């Protein structure tokens, strides 16, 4: 079901999304959804009688040469197995999916006529997919401060860092997670504003020089 909504084949090369822990024939009646699979999340899943954790960030990441109690990853994988809990992680495939992370962010912010920020391929229906979204702000342009307040309130953010390049907000790029490296695509798409979670200082300077309002 998840693979139909956000195909794992669309994940980025560095990613490790997919069915990472468990048995394929395991019966599932209760699912815990989480951003990360931590020891606390595993305990909560066990206490609530869940057979599956669906997480955004992969519980197994990078090169893993062993699964033992001597590493953080090993301890979590062993705990999942001991509790009989499977793990499926949908990361960049969910970021890129139609209706996924970035689509949801863009809709919450009031962006219409959405297109991918960077096209990585096409789905079975021939529609382009890719990480990030670009759209026009409904209701016309607004000030950077106004848009920053909207983003903070709408997305429930505890804080937001703003670079005001002195241009109104109208065509907005959204990149959930660390998407600061996509600034060239933002410029190529003619965006005046970029909302992302990346905080690298050099990219703020580059955005200012390019005349792009940046929020993170």
Where are these regions (language model features)?
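Hydrophobic structural segments
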Residues: 1-215
């Amino acid at each position: 079901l998840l693979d139909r909504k956000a195909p794992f084949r669309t994940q980025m090369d560095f990613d490790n999304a997919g069915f990472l822990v468990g048995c394929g024939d395991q019966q599932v009646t209760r699912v815990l959804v989480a951003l990360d699979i931590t020891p606390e999340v595993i305990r909560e899943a066990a206490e609530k009688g869940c057979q599956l954790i669906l997480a955004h960030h992969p519980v197994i990441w990078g090169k893993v040469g062993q699964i033992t109690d001597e590493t953080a990853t090993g301890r979590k994988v062993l705990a999942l197995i001991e509790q009989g809990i499977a793990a499926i992680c949908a990361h960049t495939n969910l970021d890129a999916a139609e209706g996924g992370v970035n689509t949801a962010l863009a809709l919450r912010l009031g962006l219409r006529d959405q297109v991918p920020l960077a096209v990585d391929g096409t789905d079975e229906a021939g529609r382009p997919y890719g990480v990030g979204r670009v759209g026009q702000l409904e209701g016309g342009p607004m000030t950077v401060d106004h848009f920053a307040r909207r983003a903070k309130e709408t997305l429930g953010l505890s804080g937001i860092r703003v670079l005001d390049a002195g241009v109104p907000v109208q065509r907005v790029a959204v990149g959930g997670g660390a998407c600061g490296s996509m600034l060239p695509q933002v410029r190529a798409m003619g965006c005046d504003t970029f909302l992302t979670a990346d905080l690298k200082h050099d990219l703020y300077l580059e955005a200012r020089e390019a005349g792009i309002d940046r929020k993170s």
